[in-house]
UniProtKB/Swiss-Prot annotation:
Name this polypeptide is given: Elongation factor G, mitochondrial
Sequence similarity: Belongs to the TRAFAC class translation factor GTPase superfamily. Classic translation factor GTPase family. EF-G/EF-2 subfamily.
UniProt xrefs under SUPFAM superfamilies: EF-G C-terminal domain-like (SSF54980), P-loop containing nucleoside triphosphate hydrolases (SSF52540), Ribosomal protein S5 domain 2-like (SSF54211), Translation proteins (SSF50447)
GO biological process: mitochondrial translational elongation
Composition skew (Polar residues), residue ranges: 69-85
Gene: MEF1
């Protein structure tokens, strides 16, 4: 979409500086701020009057420039042809829409475990007046944090399920001190990698996020995972360095890690006043003022134009650094920088907002949620720098002209349709989370277009069924507030509507559907059975849990007839086993954890397979010709298997193509090497033949299964195992013990860092080699070490391991199948 060049000049400090100009979209392009044409601006106290908007020289508007190489925006770098552009929006925002959306925010809070997300959420609710008392995580006062509403969450001190709430915040205009009320929807997400699906579905429907980092630990394994998820859904983020009161806090090291480890241009917009226990407030580098939290629980804000001498010089350096970073990603600041002119406070703030919304920059805030410092200023930053719902580009797929039989293959070729958050437009919403509530299924919905009303009839696009909305509520953690209607850009919940996570709902006047969220594959499994006689509660619980959580899978092993549950880690499965005991009064016995091995191919293989069966009367005939080849995972969709139909001339009637596709996916369910699912394969159908009488869908499905198995033998199949990124933190004196322990488990050290009396080691280790590691680490560090791990990828097992797995699988097969 963007053409031209990024200027590269030498600044007054004799350092190369890449200056990026803001991209100007054509009249047909839909940019991230596509609704600005309707008067929607988004900063604090934004106005639709011309005086409040940045005036851009028309000559500059005619320039086309490419964003600087340091920018991480995921937008196209070349101009798209007009035929590739989404059609213009069919509806426009009214003045009421503009007024409502301008002061609305939908944000998530995400981070590595124990970075202080839930503590921050608790302070946000307290300062916005949503709760009257502050309660801490782990339920030390027998109450626990508001957003951790499960007993298990309060006992373990971790967030297991994402929790949604809403609040109002009166943001302060830094220029005149006036107040403006903003409505904010907040979703607090888990930090543990085992519950990563909660982060996925939250980010899928949010307009912005707060990335929380520990001032001591910095960027950790789950931080990089959250960063990747934010990029997947193009979610702008502001960063908050929490725990600034801790000994060893070093915010400047963390800012540098955001730039280097997360590859996100970032700069501090604040400098802490005081360190560790002496933390009193922050210096606002943008508006050049000192901000202090005083009074009980930091509720009283004192603003001073006098910067403390102890941090004045550092603040000047960091403000200059902020301007330099902005000059690399924003045209206006870049031009001022090259002309050696100092931008005004307003110009800096506007540039931060533009660059943040365009995914090119992350402003970094600082504070301590536990010590009630910096949270109110962070809320002001949410209002000033993160987008409102109209400033996010939201596209839907128009299914009007799609053939249901081949809709999946046509969808990627269908032009996307922009959705407009106009209240009068046809309703479009996405169900992103399900819960079993006291009054039936609770379905969380993000309304993207139109208005959702109680007792309204809506259509599930996936099933084509019409349903009535019997009850509509807004959620405050586990509390509900009944409402009659809710407008676009809002998040709500419906009772009594049966659906699946990721379903699109409309009012029946449109044929739009939205892409669902990315669902990672499980990496660990174990056998489970009820203790004693099986009860209906056992199957009822399993059915409910796998409906609520797409990463929790249940199946029956055909050989052993055991019930197998699969998930993202040991803790993930342990939590569900414990919930079965507590919520369904069902004690369970579990087997040893099993690693989720996979099979794949390493080379292309042709097939020309004929399925014939004659039983007297109508027989079966189908012939399929084509090839299979290795396929890399698509980083955006997560898909690593694909079916392609290249048949021309009607050699296979189109009504049999879906049967071929079904046969391919059925063949992937169980590989011939170890009986595990097959991944990383593209199936290409080139030709075939049929019989006017004997051909059927069954015949083509069986022919495809036979063809795939025949080709798999020639494609040099291998076995894959999950490899984990393991993050170990321990006192420096135990460094050799930790490294030695990882080496004995065939781990590869990819990074290490020593700071003060503590060190961190990051290694890649096969999950199969990680069982029992917690006991080993505890023994080798005298109980002072801790580790976390997250799934990285599947990699080939060693040849001797593959041989053992194949031999073990062969022993389970009946003699007739060997």
């Amino acid at each position: 979409m963007f053409l031209g060049r990024a200027a590269s000049r030498t600044c007054r400090h004799s350092q190369p500086l890449r200056v990026a100009a803001r991209a100007k979209s054509t009249t047909t392009a839909v940019a991230s701020s596509s609704w600005h044409q309707y008067g929607v601006t988004g900063g604090i106290l934004a106005s639709t009057s011309s005086s409040s908007r940045t005036v851009v020289n028309p000559a500059k508007q005619r320039r086309w420039v490419r964003m600087a190489s340091t920018a991480t925006a995921t937008k196209p770098t070349e101009e798209a042809s007009s035929s590739d552009q989404p059609p213009a929006p069919a509806h426009k925002l009214t003045d009421n829409d503009v007024k409502r959306l301008t002061f609305q925010r939908n944000i998530g809070i995400s981070a590595h475990i124990d970075s202080g997300k839930t503590t921050l959420s608790e302070r946000i609710l307290f300062y916005t007046g949503k709760i009257r008392e502050i309660h801490e995580v782990r339920g030390r006062d027998a109450v626990g944090a508001k957003m951790d509403n499960m007993d298990l969450e309060r006992e373990k001190g971790i967030t297991i399920q994402s929790a949604a709430t809403f609040c109002d915040w009166e943001a302060t205009n830094p220029e005149d001190g006036s107040k403006q009320k903003y409505s904010i929807n907040v979703i607090d997400t888990p930090g543990h990698v085992d519950f990563t699906i909660e982060v996925e579905r939250a980010l899928r429907v949010l307009d912005g996020a707060i990335l929380v980092l520990c001032a001591v630990a910095g960027v950790q394994s789950q931080t990089t995972t959250v960063d990747r998820q934010m990029r997947r859904y193009n979610v702008p983020r502001i960063s908050f360095i929490n725990k600034m009161d801790r000994p060893g806090a070093n915010p400047w090291r963390i800012v540098n890690q955001i730039r280097t480890k997360l590859r996100m241009p970032a700069a501090a917009v604040q400098v802490p006043i005081g360190t560790e226990d002496e933390l009193k407030g922050v210096v606002d580098l943008v508006h050049w003022r000192a901000l202090y939290n005083e009074g009980p629980k930091g509720t009283e804000i004192r603003v001073s134009k006098d910067i403390p001498e102890s941090v004045a010089e550092l603040a000047k350096q960091k403000r200059a650094e902020l301007i330099e970073q902005l000059a690399e990603v924003d045209e206006e600041i870049g031009e001022l920088f090259l002309m050696d002119e100092t931008p005004t406070n307003r110009q800096i703030a506007d540039a931060i907002r533009r660059a943040t919304i365009d995914l090119k920059f992350s402003p970094v805030f600082m504070g301590s949620a536990m010590k009630n410092t910096g949270v109110q200023f962070l809320l002001d930053g949410v209002c000033e720098y993160l987008p409102n719902p109209s400033e996010r580009e939201v596209l839907a797929i128009d299914n009007k002209n799609l053939d249901p039989a081949t809709a999946s293959s046509q969808a990627s070729q269908t032009p996307n349709v922009p959705l407009v958050p106009a209240a009068a437009a046809p309703f479009v919403g996405l169900a992103f989370k399900l819960e079993e509530g006291r009054f039936g299924q609770l379905t969380y919905v993000r309304v993207y277009q139109g208005t959702l009303k109680k007792a309204m009839n809506i259509w599930n696009v996936r099933t084509g069924k019409k349903v009535k909305v019997p009850r509509l509520v807004r959620m405050h953690s586990d509390e509900m507030e009944d409402i009659d209607s809710i407008g676009p850009g809002e998040i709500c919940a419906m009772f009594g509507v049966e659906c699946s996570s990721g379903d699109t709902f409309t009012d029946g006047t449109s044929t739009y559907s939205m892409t669902s969220m990315f669902v990672p594959e499980p990496v660990i499994s174990l056998a489970i059975k009820p203790k004693g006689q099986e009860t209906p509660n056992f199957s009822r619980a399993l059915n409910r849990f796998q409906k609520e959580d797409p990463t929790f899978r249940v199946h029956i092993d055909q050989e052993s007839k055991e019930t197998i549950i699969s998930g993202m880690g040991e803790l993930h499965l342990e939590i569900y086993v414990e919930r079965m005991r507590r919520e369904y009064n069902t004690e369970c016995i579990t087997g040893k954890p099993r690693v989720a091995f996979r099979e794949t191919i390493t080379q292309r293989a042709e097939f020309a397979y004929t399925h014939k069966k004659q039983t007297g009367g109508a027989g079966q005939f189908a012939r399929v010709i084509g090839y299979i080849e290795p396929m890399e995972m698509d980083p955006e969709t997560g898909k690593d298997v694909a079916f392609e139909n290249l048949v021309m001339g009607g050699n296979i009637p189109t009504n049999f193509i879906p049967a071929v596709e079904k046969g391919f996916y059925e063949a992937l369910e169980k590989g011939s090497l170890t009986g595990n699912p097959i991944t990383g394969v593209r199936f290409v159908l080139k030709d075939g033949a049929f019989h006017a009488v004997d051909s059927s869908e069954l015949a083509f499905r069986l022919a495809t299964i036979g063809a795939f198995r025949e080709a798999f033998k020639k494609a040099r199949g291998i076995v894959l195992e999950p490899v984990m990124t393991v993050d170990v933190v321990a006192p420096s004196e135990f460094q050799s013990n930790v490294i030695g322990g990882l080496n004995t488990r065939r781990g590869t050290i990819v990074d290490s860092e020593v700071r003060d009396d503590e060190f961190t080691a990051v290694a890649e280790v096969a999950l199969n080699d990680m069982f029992g590691y917690s006991n080993q680490l505890r023994g080798s560090t005298q109980g002072k070490g801790e580790f976390s791990m997250e799934y990285k990828h599947h990699a080939p097992v060693l040849p001797n391991v593959q041989k053992e797995l194949e031999e073990a699988y062969q022993k389970t097969l009946p003699q007739s199948k060997k």
